[in-house]
Amino acid sequence: MDSAVDRHVFYISDGTAITAEVLGHAVMSQFPVTISSITLPFVENESRARAVKDQIDAIYHQTGVRPLVFYSIVLPEIRAIILQSEGFCQDIVQALVAPLQQEMKLDPTPIAHRTHGLTPGNLNKYDARIAAIDYTLAHDDGISLRNLDQAQVILLGVSRCGKTPTSLYLAMQFGIRAANYPFIADDMDNLVLPASLKPLQHKLFGLTINPERLAAIREERRENSRYASLRQCRMEVAEVEALYRKNQIPWINSTNYSVEEIATKILDIMGLNRRMY
């Protein structure tokens, strides 16, 4: 086994494997181990299942340690092949379905690809999410100020504080139409809320970041530039935070938060509907 890896972890599904990955990562994050992740989506036939089993077994025979296997598979014949492997296998969906089946006194009707696949029942939701992504891309970094009234949230902040990835995550994960507007160095001499944003103040949300972190990020983009200097970063952050306070714009410091955490905080603070797809 690689000395830097404590366990090999498989995420296996007859669909996208997103559910297996999300739940598996959540579980593994509770343990102080270094993992090597292997995601195998669309394991839909016995031939592919046997190849996956062989891959699991090969790692076991190579390392002497059972790989951990998080799986979500509908067809019993495919599950049976995976369960014959040398891995420690956990059915992440059935672990929850079984007690719910007993509580609700209902039999489940498992269908492959139901969670992240397209069906007549979720097509409208899917179209709405794609429309949100299109809107967010068209309104990234102040590219367009048209139709800003259609935004559900407008993120503000200095360059490289996390506006774009947060906007895209909100659109892709939750179907939120998120615009974002940058404050640049030229704005700092007389930083005011742009006239186009004043009527939409109830949709504004600010991001800030520690100047030291901002300087490090900018240094990777423009080495040894005024743009990346700590002095410039301190000045810009101070000016923008003063603007937030003056205009009573809610804001958070993104320095120690992941994109997922930032987006979730925005949804909570702004009272936006959290839609899952």
From Swiss-Prot:
It holds the Pfam family Kinase-PPPase. It catalyses: [pyruvate, water dikinase] + ADP = [pyruvate, water dikinase]-phosphate + AMP + H(+); [pyruvate, water dikinase]-phosphate + phosphate + H(+) = [pyruvate, water dikinase] + diphosphate. Signal peptide: none annotated. It is an enzyme of class 2 (transferase). The keyword Transcription does not apply. The keyword Kinase applies. Keywords: Kinase, Nucleotide-binding, Serine/threonine-protein kinase, Transferase. Its EC number is 2.7.11.33, 2.7.4.28. Bifunctional serine/threonine kinase and phosphorylase involved in the regulation of the phosphoenolpyruvate synthase (PEPS) by catalyzing its phosphorylation/dephosphorylation. HAMAP family: PSRP. This is Phosphoenolpyruvate synthase regulatory protein. It comes from Escherichia fergusonii (strain ATCC 35469 / DSM 13698 / CCUG 18766 / IAM 14443 / JCM 21226 / LMG 7866 / NBRC 102419 / NCTC 12128 / CDC 0568-73).
